[in-house]
């Protein structure tokens, strides 16, 4: 494609979806290889990198439905990978914490996951990775704003 070629939005959407599909297969495969489901992994990863949190805090970070998150927390607690404790000052609020076993499992799984993604993205140099991140973030924020506006207008 020449520098002057026009790239239309539907064509770009197809490229984005194909890329997303290919990278998702790699990411999900690396997670499954660790014996975790995707929901369990993202909950453990959030606790690993952000520390103890409530279910609601994790949900908002990883964009999971309430039912999925509750089921994941129950599974992870049964496996001894996390524990629930009461929040200081409000015993009704439950805070999730990694156990030692949970930390070992998620550190190993995350290491494998990160290595697989690094390998998949090794075709990009550091500058291209920074540019891609900035462009995708810009597009995502704009699209989220457009979607919110359309939902408010009753047209979407």
Sequence positions of predicted segments:
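C-terminal regulatory/oligomerization modules of transcriptional regulators
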Residues: 1-6, 126-156
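N-terminal leader segment of winged-helix/HTH proteins
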Residues: 1-34, 155-156
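Short alpha-helical elements of helix-turn-helix
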Residues: 10-14, 34-45, 67
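Short, locally clustered residues in the helix-turn-helix/winged-helix DNA-binding domain
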Residues: 17, 45-49, 110, 137
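Charged, amphipathic alpha-helical coiled-coil/dimerization segments
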Residues: 24, 74-137, 141
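Short capping segments at the starts of secondary-structure elements
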Residues: 50-54
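Residues within helix-turn-helix
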Residues: 55-56, 67, 74, 94
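The alpha-helix within a helix-turn-helix
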Residues: 59
